[in-house]
């Protein structure tokens, strides 16, 4: 099958790598434009563009695609199918309607649950034990197209965004190859999305702030959902502290939510117990363990997170 691949970040690059190993022919790639590095003005290509360049595949990086900008590229490459994995732009109707087999999207949830931009984070936030990949035929809605193939992925108690992302990317890559093969052979039939849906919105700063008046489990899930990026955070003595890793604490603890209840470890009172902030990064400093952080404080009395 002749395929144009549209994607941008690492997740998409892993899928493209697997696609290139398959019997399909990748005739072109579309990715987001290069963006300035955070600490310099140097333009950095996406992970997908880097991979395509290494494999000598023609790449388009249009600023806009709404008004036919991609049509000449599609007419030139003439794909049987367009594969879309975390591309980052909404596809207009002329793109959706172009290929024989339609536009196939790899989405990081078991649809219709967690439609939207952050399905992996929301699965962790909500303490799910299982999530997965859904391939679907794209329509003009947001993750509302007919489903093609689902792959389940188990979530372990110590998974964070990084580890679950990597498991999901590997599952997504295999799902993609199986989906294209099934479509071409007529072995996969599109299925309407049914049942309750929910939306995984973009992550904002307020969502990342830790509220210690919440339950321990809720706080634990928030920390792992945003680790290592964009990172959950709290404030200690007026300074922002990023939290990368936490551990639930057993036992009963006195004090009010947010109080630090140990002088040697950063154990913080919650609404129903306590949680240890094991690995942190104080504002402007490197990542460190909580014990090293506390050793560097002169006055530990009355310490609190808020």
What feature does the model see in each segment?
Residues 7, 29, 52, 176, ...:
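Residue-level signal for inorganic ion chemistry
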Residues 35-55:
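N-terminal beta-loop-helix "entrance" segment that forms/cooperates
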Residues 68-78:
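Short amphipathic alpha-helix with an adjacent loop that forms part of the alpha/beta core around
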Residues 213-306:
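An anion-binding loop in the catalytic cleft
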Residues 21-25, 32, 81-200, 204-206:
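Donor/substrate-binding cores of folate-linked one-carbon enzymes
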Residues 60, 105, 148, 242, ...:
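Conserved beta-strand segments that form the floor/walls of ligand-binding pockets within enzyme
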């Amino acid at each position: 099958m002749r395929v144009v691949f549209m994607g941008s970040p690492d997740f998409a690059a892993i899928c493209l790598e697997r696609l290139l190993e398959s019997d399909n022919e990748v005739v072109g790639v579309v990715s987001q434009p290069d963006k300035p590095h955070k600490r310099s003005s140097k333009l950095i290509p996406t992970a997908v563009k880097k991979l395509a360049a290494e494999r000598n595949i023609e790449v388009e990086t249009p600023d806009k695609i709404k008004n036919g900008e991609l049509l000449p590229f599609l007419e030139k490459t003439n794909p049987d199918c367009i594969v879309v994995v975390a591309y980052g732009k909404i596809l207009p109707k002329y793109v959706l309607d172009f290929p024989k087999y339609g536009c196939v999207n790899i989405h990081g949830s078991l649809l219709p649950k967690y439609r939207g931009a952050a399905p992996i984070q929301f699965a962790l936030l909500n303490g799910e034990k299982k999530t997965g990949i859904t391939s679907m035929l794209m329509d003009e809605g947001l993750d509302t197209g007919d489903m093609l193939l689902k792959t389940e992925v188990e979530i372990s108690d110590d998974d964070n965004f990084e580890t679950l992302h990597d498991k999901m990317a590997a599952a997504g890559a295999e799902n993609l190859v199986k989906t294209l093969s099934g479509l071409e052979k007529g072995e996969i039939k599109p299925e309407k999305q049914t049942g309750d849906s929910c939306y995984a919105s973009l992550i904002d700063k307020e969502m990342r702030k830790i509220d210690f008046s919440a339950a321990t489990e809720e706080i634990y899930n928030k920390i792992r959902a945003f680790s290592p990026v964009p990172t959950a955070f709290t404030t200690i003595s007026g300074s922002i502290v990023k939290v990368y890793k936490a551990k639930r604490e057993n036992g009963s603890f006195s004090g009010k939510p947010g109080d630090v209840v140990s002088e040697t470890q950063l154990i913080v009172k919650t609404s129903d117990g306590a949680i240890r902030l094991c690995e942190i990064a104080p504002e402007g400093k490197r990542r460190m363990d909580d014990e090293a952080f506390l050793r560097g404080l002169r006055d530990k009395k009355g310490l609190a997170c808020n």
